[in-house]
Amino acid sequence: MSIVHPDTSKYEFNFEPFLRKEYSFSLDPDRPVCQYYNSREGIKSCPNGARCPNKHVLPIFQNKIVCKHWLRGLCKKNDQCEYLHEYNLRKMPECVFFTKNGYCTQSPECQYLHVDHKSQLEECEDYNMGFCPSGPACTKKHVKKVLCPRYLVGFCPLGKDCDWSHPKFKVPSEHSKLRIKKDEHINTRKMDEERERRLNAIINGDILVT
Amino acid sequence: MNVFDEILQPTVVNKCLHGNFTSAEREEYVVARTNVLSVFRVSRAQKLVLAYEWKLAGKIIDMQLLPQIGSPLKMLAILSSKSKVSLVRFDPVAESLETLSLHYYHDKFVNLSTSSLKTESIMAVDPLFRCLLVFNEDVLAILPLKLNTEDMEIDEDENGIKEPMAKRLKRNQGITSDSIIMPISSLHKSLKHVYDIKWLNNFSKPTVGILYQPVLAWCGNEKVLGNTMRYMVLSLDVEDEKTTVIAELADLPNDLHTLVPLKRGYVLIGVNELLYISASGALQSCIRLNTFATSSINTRITDNSDMNIFLSKSSIYFYKALKRHDLLILIDENCRMYNIITESEGNLLTKFDCVQVPIVNEIFKNSRLPLSVCGDLNLETGRVLIGFLSGDAMFLQLKNLKVAFAAKRQLVETVDDDDDEYSALYGESQNNTHTRIVETQEPFDISLLDSIFNIGPLTSLTIGKVASVEPTIQRLPNPNKDEFSIVATSGVGRGSHLTALHSTVQPHIEQALKFTSATRIWNLKIKGKDKYLVTTDADKEKSDVYQIDRNFEPFRAQDFRKDSRTIGMETMDDDKRILQVTSGGLYLFDVDFKRLARLTIDIEIVHACIIDPYILFTDARGNIKIYQLDSKNKKKFIKFKLPEALNEIIITSGSIFKSNICNKFLHGLENSSQEQLLFTFVTGDNQVIFFTEKHNDRIFQLNGVDQLEDMLFISTYQIPEEMNPDPSIKQIMLNRLGHHKKEEFLTILTFGGEIYQYKKSTKHSGKLLKCKSHPLITGAPNNAYPQGVNKIERVAHYFPNYNGYSVVFITGQVPYIIIKEDNSVCRIFRMTNIPIVTMARWGKNSVMCVDNIKNARVMKLDPECYYGNTQILRKIIIEDVVEEFETLGNIAYHERTGMYIISYTKFIEYQALSEDGEPLVGYDPSKPNSTGYKSGLLLINPLTWNIIDRLDLSENSMVNDIKTMLIQLNSKTRRKRELVIIGSSFVKEEDQPSTGCLLVLDITEVVAEPGKPDSNFKFKQLFEEEIRGSVNAVCEISGRFMIGQSSKALVRDMQEDNSAVPVAFLDMPVFITDAKSFSNLMIIGDSMQGFTFVGFDAEPYRMIVLGKSTSKFQVMNLEFLVNNGNINFIVTDRQNHLHVLRYAPDEANSLSGQRLVHCNSFNMFTTNNYMKLVRKHVEFGSKTSNYIALGCQTDGSIFRMIPLNEASYRRFYLVQQQLLDHEIPLAGFNTKMERLDNEYYHKGHSLRPTLDSQVLKKYIHLPITKRTTIENRVGRHASTELWHDLIDIEFSLRSLTNSN
């Protein structure tokens, strides 16, 4: 266990049953949602009741509109409120203005999601494989990566945590302009002849090798 | 419940005095470092050598030396918190402090005061020692002293008719009379808001000068109110409690803060000006120090405003009345020195000037914020000791201070050519008065003689690898492998640096060898060179000789006994003979291992000690034999005649030492300090007996050693009638320890592995005093901790020169070193992180150590470290060739890459600009600007401590918090990555709303620059956001992170595109100061309203307030303290309290947990700056992980807070009670009052306080009889359990060294 970042998530507290009962709150925030629990029917819908180790999502979180009183810390209804008591900007809808115009007049304060569609472009497969014939004109994203030398030699112990890229061998798709040529396509007789001719020329001293 | 343990003693010198406190012959400095009182003596080499050190139970706020009647030594008046004065003198018999009288003023002050008292009072002593005053806010206590006999006569003359002297003495034999306590307004009705109060010189009755301001004013309302500061001189009639106003001055500038009484007048120090007031109370002159100085003052004004000096309240002064005039030196917070020249003819001031002392050698480069100055100084030469808050305390030599006057004189000379003044000033003593050329004079010289190590103020700390960065050294595993150190940022301004705290010695490895199996090694030096290495293996009964200079080739020595176990090996007779002691006998060789003599012994020899020409050995039956090498041919062993009584005693071990400890008892040597050979033995009943070469059957003993008494004395040995052998002492050593100045110590190593030390008394020969200062627990008696001593035998080895230090090493599974710096007491440290089986001296000043896996390393002490504090300290200076980074503020350790991230803050001139870059209205460019800040981040590689990358933030920004944390980058895979989260704020004027910035950084590996192999990492900025509100705290919470932006706590989640989206928030009352998390629970501290305990839940994101503190703490820092499934919180506040609260939903009055239960409050003596949670090392039993909290403080100390289980807590509580009840507190500092008395006392559980390990550890040093009494009170078999508990506390940070 790391001494710099001790892992405290597994610690068992004496008061955990109390928290579960009182706040339907448990010590792992990312625990799965209980499959039996139905927020309309209440706690009885789950056979484990208040002792259920999984998440019981309260009915208040089914609401869509955030409670304006709660945002100012003034809502007195608590869990019985008919509005949503959650401030999660991940769930905000996309800003229409920004999507349309590429900028937003409310810019730093706008609470709606500003999705930069450029950043959502797919990565260019050809570029990732080594070469994209369309160059800068390519409609897809060209992300520059550094190949991991360890991975290239065979094995990188860091695996997914490695900072450098671990390119996978990939067969180009049908739409790609890159093709894998078969051996017979490459070694044509014409090429062989050409090579022989050059070799002879070198032997005869017609061409100086530099 | 918890125990508070200080793991690093305070280092900031907050008060120092010059005078004779313990010795009249030597020049002494009395130094206070928060609660440590030390007496230093000046050695011949002009160094400070520690004479005595006492750890008191409370903070020393101020102290003064007072004369003692009938003694050349002075006594000490110590002011502690709660306005308590202790009068203390040095007790030469016990060599300790003796409390003469105690004066408590706090309760009376509280009753009399109309406003709330300040935490620290002011103490002032009358120059003629007639009385002493303690002042706080608006109340005053006067303590009349009866110290000065001359003064008493004067008193008698005055009051003789009314009250005869003899009668008065009879009534009160003490040194003080009854104190007079009164509100300050009863001295004079106009007195209010007193800034400074001092006793004045040259008055027949005690007279005070008071600087006060009846109507408060500041620069904002100065135009309306004008100058309202006043000055008053009051004469006190202590007997009749009457006062007379002697002088009064009104309309003084509002920035005055300090009053300095001179011989014939007073100097008032203000931030912007200096005023001179004559003895009659007339304002005679004013010096303007900068352009802010007031112009509306009606006196002669000298304009020095081009000097641009600001003398803030933290500047200190040194004053000494010399024969002809006064010497007054001011030191401002940037450590510039100013000389204040005052000259007067009669009452008329002829000259008043301020000159900067020309210091050319940048001696104060790394010092800031001076706290105290003392010393002996005149115009020619002198020495001063200055204590700084930031930077080492300096012991300085000043030469030719008069040049500071002279330089100015030249300037004067060019103006009005007036050298009469000059000759008047220096008189005839000045030889070159009439030579006008300044160059012929010796220049002013200031040089550093010695310094006292200081690492304060500590601002933040982290845990990281320092010496264990490299896994192997010289192709063998690093002896400090996988070891973590505490790394802290310390200091302010240019002297700021990093401090690494090592819990083990981290030596330099000079050479490393792979070895054959050996249980002991010897290094034979022939003609000053390492020649032979002898090894022996006790299990295989084998010995070998190797030649060191021939690359460790085996030496074919035919006569050498290879087939038996070697017990001892030594060269004799000036390196012409080699002696081998094997288990079967003695063998004498010449330098080429040719046998010269042999002596076979029938019974197996188990232990030998060889000091030329004597050989002492003990055999398996416990018999002692001493042989002597024949003095003529050096070829024969002659039996040495032992005292007869020795045959009847059971002996466990014996050694020969050189010492002059018993010269007093030897005929003809009474007054000599020549060292004698002492044949020393430990008997079966733990007595230490010894005799000399010419013993005449006379044996001495060290009385009291069997019970480990506080003081041992030498007496003639009488064989006891009955002897119950129960050996506990394994080995003793009597030798000199130290660096330049060595002192004699008796070191006792017990079978249980404990180390006890006694120091030879300097005053009485033949007496030894127990060293009680902050011990390290190394073992336990009665087989309570067998794990410590099994596997590898503990043997003490003495090395007279290990890098200049005389040290004792103790081998074992956990090896130790006993080392002493000249300016500290003896310290015991763990030596490396590996077991050491045996060791031998190597080369000139190194040591070869062999570990349990046959690796041998030649180790040298790291000279950069300081070994005088309770932990090994190493200063690490972060420098760039081009620029200085000034204050280093926050530090974090990035575990994946092993890099440190540090924030720096530079002082810049503040430009008062509005948001659009225009100067603000009222901005005056001609006046000096205020200070602003510019900060940034540095990436440091601990391999070289070079800066390998940096990130500068914009001007006026200030980094508030840096943390490295494991952040979930992808909500699906939950892969976590260690990121650096930084919170900063912009420091602007008060009209603009506060803004801040959040930065998320990653550290990525890059290809190192050529020539710089350490620069293989760089910052990579992932996310940045400007935030409305200053970001004061960042904190990890279940893979997300929380930032405190002004009063809002916002949890953010990292998304795949590296943006940090807010997912939950919680409003806090005023301003978030600190936040910490444990699992998905979080505590958020508020600057005014206590703290909140919050639970965090994801999807849906919630922050549930589980509980709140009911008291409104002004939170500085907080931390979790988790123990046995319970959760406690420790909170430090701005009043230097440490509170322990608990989340207890079961408890009756906790409103099902919503109110956090206040357990107790504990006073700390200084401000806490940072706290961190560390996993606790579990030495005994349970596998559950517990955590302790580490905290660092302004005075350079570091503490840990250790949770205890109920059983150990109760045992400790009983021990603490017993110790407090039966031990007399040093200097009258009462632990309970100093630690527990505060306004929160009644809120907590008074019977369950936080324990102080300083008290608990006294138990270790009690004599055995007293220990048994306490153990019996605690319970049956309590001894073992108590020792286990103590070891558990002591070893709780071993998780840093045994991290895996």
UniProtKB/Swiss-Prot annotation, chain A:
Keywords: Metal-binding, mRNA processing, Nucleus, Repeat, RNA-binding, Zinc, Zinc-finger. GO terms for cellular component: nucleus. SUPFAM superfamilies: CCCH zinc finger. A zinc finger (C3H1-type) spans 28-59, 61-88, 89-117, 118-142, 143-169. The keyword Metal-binding applies. It is found in: Nucleus. Its main location: nucleus. PROSITE patterns: ZF_C3H1 (PS50103). It holds the Pfam family zf-CCCH_2. One of its GO terms (biological process) is mRNA processing. One of its GO terms (molecular function) is zinc ion binding. InterPro entries: CPSF4/Yth1, Znf_CCCH, Znf_CCCH_sf. Belongs to the CPSF4/YTH1 family. PANTHER family: CLEAVAGE AND POLYADENYLATION SPECIFICITY FACTOR SUBUNIT 4, CLEAVAGE AND POLYADENYLATION SPECIFICITY FACTOR SUBUNIT 4-RELATED. Component of the cleavage factor I (CF I) involved in pre-mRNA 3'-end processing. This is mRNA 3'-end-processing protein YTH1. It comes from Kluyveromyces lactis (strain ATCC 8585 / CBS 2359 / DSM 70799 / NBRC 1267 / NRRL Y-1140 / WM37). The gene is YTH1.
From Swiss-Prot, chain B:
It holds the Pfam family CPSF_A. Transmembrane segments: none annotated. It comes from the Eukaryota. Gene3D superfamilies: YVTN repeat-like/Quinoprotein amine dehydrogenase. GO terms for cellular component: nucleus. GO terms for molecular function: RNA binding. Keywords: mRNA processing, Nucleus, RNA-binding. InterPro entries: Beta-prop_RSE1/DDB1/CPSF1_1st (IPR018846), Cleavage/polyA-sp_fac_asu_C (IPR004871), RSE1/DDB1/CFT1/CPSF1 (IPR050358), WD40/YVTN_repeat-like_dom_sf (IPR015943). GO terms for biological process: mRNA processing. It is found in: Nucleus. RNA-binding component of the cleavage and polyadenylation factor (CPF) complex, which plays a key role in polyadenylation-dependent pre-mRNA 3'-end formation and cooperates with cleavage factors including the CFIA complex and NAB4/CFIB. Involved in poly(A) site recognition. May be involved in coupling transcription termination and mRNA 3'-end formation. PANTHER family: DNA REPAIR/RNA PROCESSING CPSF FAMILY. Belongs to the CFT1 family. This is Protein CFT1. The gene is CFT1.
